[in-house]
Amino acid sequence: MEVVTLFELYELEERLRARGFCHDTREGAPICRWLVERVTVDVMPTEATVLGMASEWFHEAVTTAARMDLGDGLKAPVIKRPHFLATKLTAYRDRGAKDPYMSKDLEDIVTLFDGCQETGFLLEDGSSSLKNFITSGMQVHLENPEFVEAVEGCFRSDPVSRERSRIVLERMRAIATARS
């Protein structure tokens, strides 16, 4: 479901509450996060005027989302990985780049790269403009020594974690130099 207006967001929130969802009120939780049992759902409007957050990729992410079967006849739209990365790169650019060491968006980007064996999937299923945005964004960020240092800072200082950090940066560089 695409939410464009504040009224539509309120309607969706009422529907979520009726199904047992509640806002995640834990410290550090984003304002868009909802919980039910062990399921976590982030509900993001596609228009910036609704929650004051925007990404030029939200609309495309919603319209190209895959449907995931959650069982019991319940299906949920899940945005594709390239769109998730693009929305996180946008969020990092708009709010996290000012202080990369404290950026939750950078942590999410690092987690995405840390959790993949191959980087190609981060560019699959995306338009050329999306792929160009991702590759150029990664190029710009990797040129910033504070970004690289903050990525390294997302890991512990033991040898295994240092190696993970090196692998993540290597994967980021592979995306930055990929051609669509």
Language model features with spans:
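Compositionally biased terminal segments of proteins
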Residues: 1-180
